[in-house]
């Protein structure tokens, strides 16, 4: 079980003070120095940011076949965390490949670079104290190990959305499985490319058996924020 720091109620005035104080200190320091670079040695630590947010940063790495429910569960979890006053950020294929990874294709090299960039971005969020959810097929152990190495073993929690391919194909919201069956999509995971199931995930959820709400409850229990 992963334990998050529970949020603490703060008055609005205290919150504003917390935002103003570092700016005042930094402005005073800059006025007495000609070179700004030494300031980076005094950047706020991860612990400082987690204390401000009253939570711990963590990486929930959702892996599973296309259509398994990764993004759906991630969005539902984000809403529940938000209700509890916890800051969360979702990274998934749609918002990443339309922006920072728009120049990448689906070759083996590009898939690896896609995951590498996602992990580097995720690490920045985690180091800021944000609960970060990545929803990517990430079909091989090698790719998931790469992400873990970048983010850090203690922060990286592998969540396997283990919905069977039959159910994923039945859903086929984007029509990708049908296109892959017709040979229109090459190297499609589960059809023309393999998926290596995680051997020791922190949590495994089969959305063909568990409703989304129940899946989210398991995740909240895992995070100790029920």
Which residues does each predicted region cover?
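The conserved Walker
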Residues: 66
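Conserved lysine of the Walker
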Residues: 70
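Small-molecule kinase domains that catalyze NTP-dependent phosphoryl transfer to phosphate-bearing small molecules
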Residues: 162-218, 225-226
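ATP-dependent NMP and nucleoside kinases share a basic, alpha-helical "lid"
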Residues: 99-106, 122-180, 187
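Conserved substrate/cofactor phosphate-moiety recognition/catalytic segment
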Residues: 75-120
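Conserved beta-strand scaffold positions in the cores of enzyme catalytic domains, especially
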Residues: 90, 156-160, 202-204
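Hydrophobic anchor at the beta1->P-loop junction of P-loop NTPases
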Residues: 62
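Extreme N-terminal, non-catalytic leader segments
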Residues: 2-3, 8, 12-15, 19-59
């Amino acid at each position: 079980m992963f334990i998050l720091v529970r949020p603490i109620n703060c008055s609005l005035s205290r919150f504003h003070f917390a935002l103003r104080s570092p700016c005042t200190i930094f402005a005073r320091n800059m006025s007495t120095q000609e070179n700004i670079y030494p300031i980076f040695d005094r950047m706020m630590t991860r612990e400082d940011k987690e204390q401000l947010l009253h939570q711990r940063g963590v990486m929930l790495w959702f892996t599973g076949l296309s259509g398994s429910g990764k993004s759906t569960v991630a969005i539902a979890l984000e809403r529940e965390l938000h209700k509890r006053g916890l800051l969360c950020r979702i990274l998934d294929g749609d918002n990443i490949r339309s922006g920072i990874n728009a120049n990448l294709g689906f070759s083996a090299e590009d898939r690896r670079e896609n995951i590498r960039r996602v992990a580097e971005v995720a690490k920045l969020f985690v180091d800021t104290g944000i609960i970060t959810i990545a929803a990517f097929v990430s079909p091989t152990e090698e790719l998931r190990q790469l992400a873990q190495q970048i983010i850090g073993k203690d922060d990286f929690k592998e969540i396997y959305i283990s919905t069977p391919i039959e159910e994923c194909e039945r859903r086929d919201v984007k029509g990708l499985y049908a296109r892959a069956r017709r040979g229109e999509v090459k190297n499609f995971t589960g059809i023309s490319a393999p998926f290596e199931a995680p051997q020791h995930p922190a949590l495994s959820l089969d959305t063909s058996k568990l409703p989304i709400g129940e899946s989210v409850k398991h995740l909240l229990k895992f995070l100790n924020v029920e």
